[in-house]
Structure formats: structure tokens, C-alpha cells
């Protein structure tokens, strides 16, 4: 339930509301407010706000994020409150946004490896919880130099401060994504390339010593061609740098790989 009131002026917008969440017959109230002011019309607007909510950490959500978690877990919901500010706008062929936020998270879920009982060589992950503050800095740029060409770049940096744990175990703090796509033949042939970078995450080895896993540097290219209006073929070549990395301790990711298939659109 998120009741809110929004007032629009000539160059400003004010939203005031509240986010009401419930869990185990308990109710939680979070702010849902934002103020935006157009400094230079659509070219530049500044904004500030407050928000929050209850992240319901059920087993499906957690196992989607980490497929190697244990089946028996102490599952708790995460309570999040955030205050933020930033700017956004459009300048010619460019759309941009930048934002800095401060979050307080109660029951932030962290992941540490443990030996599987029936197979000590295989790792599973237990959940740990901590109260954390996170400063998040993020920005994005989208450009259309010509109608057939689109370029995008997004980056984010999280600065964690934890109450109990030494590190944000298995949580990345930096991500960068870039994509270039070009429509070679209108509605028929497309080529694209992508870049994805992520810092190495902290974990603990079998002796309980702190360990920093390798970072990710992934470059990919691909193409798609529609033979008919609704039927086409695609080919993707991923991880051109053949980056060998463990996103989860003892579970290496796939190196250079090629994927092809059929595309359908309706």
C-alpha cells in the first residue's frame, strides 16, 4: 500500500507519500517523497527524495540471486530506508542521470561458503545478516547519434559500512555496463556489442581467511537477422577476453562461449 499525493508546478514537482508494508502481522512505514526542480527545462533538473521498503527475502528470491545456497536457512526480511539526490536531463542526442543515495539496511543478506555434508569438495552457502549503511553513487548516459545507432553506459559504486561483519561477503560494490547497438537493415538486421565489469567480491576460504576473488571483465558481440517478419536467427559471442572468474567461491564462470538460435517476434 503506497498512498501518495503529487503536485505539479510549472518547473517543479512535489510528491509526498508513505509506503506501508507488513510481515508476520507487523506493519512498517517508510517515506515515499521526492522534490524535483527544472533548472534548465528538460536540459537539467535536480531532485531529492526519501524512500524505502521491506525486501521480502523468500527462498525463491535468494536462490535466484545465489543458486548454491543451502536448503535450510534462517530467512529474514530486509528493512531498507533511503535518502537520495541527483540530477537528470536531455541535451541534444544525450540523455543522462546521476544520483547519490544513503541507505540504511537492517538484515542485509550476506553469503559465506560451507562444506556440503555429503560432499566436502562441494560448497554451499549459508546466510548471514548484518545492519549496514550503504552510500550508492550511480550514473547513466544514453546517446542516439543517429536513429539507427544507440549507445548506453551505466555505472554504480556501493560503499558498505557494516555493524558486525568485516566485509560484505559475496556482494559486489562496483558495476559498469555498456552497450552499442546498430540497426544495419531497418527492422531486419541488427548488430550489437556489450561490456560488463564487476569488482571481485570478498569471501572466506576453508581456513576462515579473508579472500578477494577475481574481478569480471566481459566483452560480448552479437548479431540478429530476420529472414521473415516474425522469424530470425541470432549469434552471440560472449566473454571475448576469456575472463576466468568465480562469482561464487569454488564455482567458476564460463569462459569464451558462443550461443546461437532462433528469434521469434509477434
Report the location of each language-model feature.
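Outer-membrane beta-barrel transmembrane domain signature of Gram-negative proteins
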Residues: 1-10
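Exposed, low-structure sequence patches enriched in small/polar residues
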Residues: 11-13, 19-30, 34-266
Amino acid at each position: 500500500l503506497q498512498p501518495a499525493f503529487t503536485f505539479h508546478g510549472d518547473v517543479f514537482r512535489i510528491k509526498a507519500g508513505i509506503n506501508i508494508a507488513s510481515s508476520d502481522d507487523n506493519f512498517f512505514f517508510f517515506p515515499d517523497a521526492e522534490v524535483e526542480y527544472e533548472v534548465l527545462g528538460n536540459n537539467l533538473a535536480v531532485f531529492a527524495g526519501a524512500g524505502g521498503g521491506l525486501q521480502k527475502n523468500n527462498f525463491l528470491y535468494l536462490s535466484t540471486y545465489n543458486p548454491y545456497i543451502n536448503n535450510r536457512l534462517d530467512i529474514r526480511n530486509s528493512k531498507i530506508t533511503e535518502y537520495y539526490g541527483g540530477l537528470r536531463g536531455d541535451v541534444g542526442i544525450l540523455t543522462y542521470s546521476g544520483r547519490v543515495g544513503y541507505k540504511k539496511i537492517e538484515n542485509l543478506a550476506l553469503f559465506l561458503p560451507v562444506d556440503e555434508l555429503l560432499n566436502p569438495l562441494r560448497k554451499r552457502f549459508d546466510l548471514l545478516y548484518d545492519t549496514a549503511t550503504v552510500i550508492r553513487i550511480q550514473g547513466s548516459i544514453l546517446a542516439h547519434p543517429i536513429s539507427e545507432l544507440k549507445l548506453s553506459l551505466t555505472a554504480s559504486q556501493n560503499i558498505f559500512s557494516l555493524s558486525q561483519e568485516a566485509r560484505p561477503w559475496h556482494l559486489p560494490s562496483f558495476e559498469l555496463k555498456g552497450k552499442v547497438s546498430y540497426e544495419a537493415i531497418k527492422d531486419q538486421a541488427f548488430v550489437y556489442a556489450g561490456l560488463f565489469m564487476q569488482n571481485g567480491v570478498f569471501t572466506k576460504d576453508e581456513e576462515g581467511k579473508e579472500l578477494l576473488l577475481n574481478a569480471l571483465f566481459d566483452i560480448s558481440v552479437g548479431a540478429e537477422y530476420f529472414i521473415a517478419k516474425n522469424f530470425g536467427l541470432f549469434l552471440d559471442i560472449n566473454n571475448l577476453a576469456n575472463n576466468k572468474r568465480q562469482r561464487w567461491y569454488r564455482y567458476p564462470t564460463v569462459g569464451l562461449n558462443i550461443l546461437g538460435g532462433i528469434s521469434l517476434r509477434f
